Amino acid sequence: MRAILLGPQRRPTLDAVVRPLFPSGPAGPFATVTAGWQEREPDDGELSALLGGRVVKLELYRRWLDVQERDPEYATAERALQEMLAELQDLYLLRLDYALRAVYALQRRAGTDRLGGTLTERVASPVAEAVAAVRELDAAHLGHVNEVRGEFFARLQPHDRPVIASHRASVADILGGASALVVAGGHVGVLADVLHLFNVAAALQSTALPFMTGRSPVIAWSAGAMALADRIVLFHDRSPHGPGHPEVYGSGLSITRDVVLLPHARARLRLDDTLRMAVFAQRFAPARCVLLEAGTRLEFSGDGGFPSGTRVLAEDGHVTSPAAA
């Protein structure tokens, strides 16, 4: 499936990206997702203008609110699910903090150790082992999250619930006539939840939809791009409360695989701290940690290759290109 990922759109580039994709104009409207804006979902006038006014809104947040109102059994169960996931995340973060403190302590030891032997013999192996322990923790947490979500959907059977089934059919019908799907940013957790609930990935993969021709793309930026990945990682080194540990949040739509997407990387990450960035990259290898900065345009076709101009965190902690990494 063709995915075009953009940098943040505070200074929009969307119109310039879309124009050459459809030189004769799109055959159908652009299906848009602004659910990440939550209550501001309808405030999409600028987005519509950038797309030439040819938009049809999926209104996934409004649909989710409708499910909350008209299917109280599902709404109650979903609230319980969110409480369980929040508890899982808290326990994971507690363990992650101790695990990463050990990694960073071993890194510092590498710079001060006066004992004999090579650096590799004395320090590199313990650091690698400590990073491996963090990787195991990340993988176990993602597995637990997916297991809990899977059990929830198996028990609640959304496809058999009339309100949800009706919305899913409506979303699939809209996508069937769209020239492209455009996913804006916002709250990545909300985006991922509603994209899963209304079965957007399955609709995109349907052979009845034009997206399978390879000509019609999914276009996304910021949190919208993160929600397309197989693994969503939250990160912020410059929060008011001090640097936070990059944390695995859950699974996205898996339209893009083996990438960890990092919008606003320069603003949110201490890219000059190569030791910290090295741990970041090593934690998620062989997936590439891809920077999505203002002006970025990356096109993924599902062949496993990386577009020209991709900027990634290398395992030595430097920002580079895949060819050089």
PLM features per residue range, with description:
Residues 166-174:
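Short, charged beta->alpha transition segments
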Residues 1-122, 126, 232-234, 238-325:
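C-terminal and late-domain segments of enzyme folds
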Residues 18-19, 171-172, 201-209, 277-281:
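Short amphipathic alpha-helical segments and helix-helix/interface helices
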Residues 174, 184-187, 192-271:
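Class I SAM-dependent methyltransferase SAM-binding "motif I" and its flanking Rossmann-like core
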Residues 178:
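An anion/phosphate-binding loop that grips the pyrophosphate of nucleotide cofactors and donors
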Residues 109-162:
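Long, low-complexity, polar/charged, intrinsically disordered or flexibly structured peripheral segments
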Residues 8-10, 157-162, 191-196, 238:
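Short, flexible loop segments at the rims of nucleotide/cofactor-binding pockets, characterized by
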